[in-house]
């Protein structure tokens, strides 16, 4: 099914934020912070995997992902979609179906030997591959999968995250020659939280303190205070 409608970016971002709140995918715990893939400590966590259990919401989010890519990257820019083990795999399958493309997945660790040891599925040499993750903060885990695809002979110029923390900008992606596409960010989540009063004042203050100075907050709460980008 090829996407043919292209909603406004702001509308998509707000709706995804509302849907994540609706399915209770937003978690807060400043006393026992969450540890992100980057090694950072965070008082908030978005469980995008919950989207899979809500078919209407899941379908809408994947429609938005397809619209975002077709509009911003183009209709004939990819030869296959790659999902990273584990969270990216189902979203890769859903997106590949919408775009009418083959799908592969990338293991966290090689299985066996050879340049394709981390790749499951058919990826011919020189394939233009889009890597998808459910969410990304600094790109740490996404680039592990991107590097594996490149090492196996694939070309990766684009990545997409359904949710992007957007607290460090995109320098890591610029340096890695990858254009990052995304649908919603933490600023969208906060806008909905404020409008619907989903956080009390103390919680809101803690979340904003983290978003304004994430590494400082992380360092004070058991996480890394600097990133190797």
From Swiss-Prot:
It is an enzyme of class 2 (transferase). Orotate binds at residue 137. Gene3D superfamilies: 3.40.50.2020. It catalyses: orotidine 5'-phosphate + diphosphate = orotate + 5-phospho-alpha-D-ribose 1-diphosphate. Pathway: Pyrimidine metabolism; UMP biosynthesis via de novo pathway; UMP from orotate: step 1/2. Keywords: Glycosyltransferase, Magnesium, Pyrimidine biosynthesis, Transferase. Its EC number is 2.4.2.10. GO terms for biological process: 'de novo' UMP biosynthetic process; pyrimidine nucleobase biosynthetic process. Its cofactor is Mg(2+). GO terms for molecular function: magnesium ion binding; orotate phosphoribosyltransferase activity. It holds the Pfam family Pribosyltran. CDD domains: PRTases_typeI (cd06223). The keyword Magnesium applies. 5-phospho-alpha-D-ribose 1-diphosphate binds at residues 107-108, 111, 113, 133-141. HAMAP family: PyrE. NCBIfam families: PRK00455.1-3 (NF001729), pyrE (TIGR00336). Belongs to the purine/pyrimidine phosphoribosyltransferase family. PyrE subfamily. Catalyzes the transfer of a ribosyl phosphate group from 5-phosphoribose 1-diphosphate to orotate, leading to the formation of orotidine monophosphate (OMP). Homodimer. This is Orotate phosphoribosyltransferase. It comes from Rhizobium leguminosarum bv. trifolii (strain WSM2304). The lineage of its organism: Bacteria, Pseudomonadati, Pseudomonadota, Alphaproteobacteria, Hyphomicrobiales.
């Amino acid at each position: 099914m090829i996407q043919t409608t292209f909603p406004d970016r702001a509308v998509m971002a707000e709706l995804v934020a509302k849907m994540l709140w609706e399915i209770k995918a937003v978690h807060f715990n400043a006393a026992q912070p969450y540890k992100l893939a980057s090694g950072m400590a965070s008082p908030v966590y978005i469980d995008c995997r919950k989207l899979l259990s809500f078919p209407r919401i899941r379908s809408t989010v994947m429609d938005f992902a397809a619209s975002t890519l077709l509009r911003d990257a183009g209709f004939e820019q990819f030869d296959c979609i790659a999902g990273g083990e584990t969270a990216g795999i189902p979203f890769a399958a859903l997106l590949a179906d919408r775009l009418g493309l083959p799908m592969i997945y990338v293991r966290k660790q090689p299985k066996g030997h050879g340049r394709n040891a981390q790749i499951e599925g058919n990826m011919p040499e020189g394939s233009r591959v889009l890597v998808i993750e459910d969410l990304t903060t600094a790109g740490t885990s996404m680039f592990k999968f991107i590097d594996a695809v490149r090492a196996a002979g694939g070309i990766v110029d684009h990545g997409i995250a359904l949710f992007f923390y957007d607290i460090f900008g995109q320098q890591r992606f610029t340096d890695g020659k990858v254009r990052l596409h995304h649908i919603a960010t933490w600023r969208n989540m906060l806008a909905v939280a404020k409008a619907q009063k989903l956080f009390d004042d103390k919680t809101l203050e803690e979340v904003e303190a983290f978003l304004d100075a994430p590494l400082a907050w992380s360092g004070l709460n058991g996480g890394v205070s600097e990133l190797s980008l």
